[in-house]
Regions:
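N-proximal low-complexity "stem/linker" segments adjacent to membrane-targeting elements
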Residues: 1-6
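Structural motif
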Residues: 8, 121-122
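N-terminal strand-loop element at the rim of the active site
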Residues: 11-18, 31, 35-98
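Histidine-centered beta-alpha loop that forms part of the nucleotide-sugar donor binding/catalytic region
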Residues: 14, 127-128, 150-153
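A conserved mid-protein helix/loop that constitutes part of the nucleotide-sugar donor-binding site
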Residues: 22-27
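An aromatic- and histidine-rich active-site surface loop
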Residues: 100-115, 123-143
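Membrane-proximal helix-turn-helix segments that form the acceptor-binding/catalytic region
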Residues: 109-119, 150-167
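Active-site-proximal region of nucleotide-activated glycan assembly enzymes
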Residues: 142-145, 165-167
Length: 167
């Protein structure tokens, strides 16, 4: 017997700014057959200029973020010294390489809690130039399949290439 329940897909993005990535996502969300798919959009912030254009059938949820210094202090307060040391290590590593991609990716995976117990059929990181979005989709949102949407030229951010090779 065929399973008629809709497939669940989660898209992960920073914010709904005015840009090509955001506009392409809005077009995609408007083209989806919502009788076949249940869509959730995870955003860091819901105050973007294009937020009002998101299809009302899409469930929009925020994902908690914190800056690296606050996360480091919180780990020390909780007596999580190994996590605090890891944070210091990655801060030093990012500064030595002058590469905030390393630091952003580390804190996205280590400091952002899982967003819930709901498991999606597919999780799509819809913003490849944002390590926190990629890491959030990869590590913090449960899903059977994971995908990375590359919109634009990958060579525009050469500092990102070593990070993407690990994904």
């Amino acid at each position: 017997m065929k399973n008629d329940s809709p497939k669940s897909i989660a898209f992960v993005l920073d914010e709904m700014y005015v840009g090509g990535t955001e506009k392409s996502l809005i077009e995609l969300l408007n083209a989806i057959d919502y009788s076949k798919y249940k869509i959730t959009l995870f955003l860091k912030n819901t105050s973007g200029a294009l937020q009002h254009l998101v299809n009302p059938k899409v469930s929009v949820r925020c994902w908690y973020t914190t800056d690296s210094q606050t996360a480091l202090i919180n780990h020390v307060k909780k007596l999580e010294f190994v996590r605090a040391f890891e944070g210091l290590y990655y801060r030093c590593l990012a500064r030595m390489h002058r590469n905030d991609w390393v630091l952003n990716a580390h804190y996205a995976t280590m400091c952002i809690p899982a967003v819930g117990k709901e498991k999606f059929d597919c999780v799509v990181a819809y913003q490849y130039c944002s390590p926190s979005v990629v890491a959030m989709a990869l590590h913090n949102i449960p899903g059977k399949k994971k995908a990375l949407f590359v919109h634009g030229k990958a060579n525009r951010a050469p500092k990102l290439n070593p990070f993407l090779e690990k994904v």
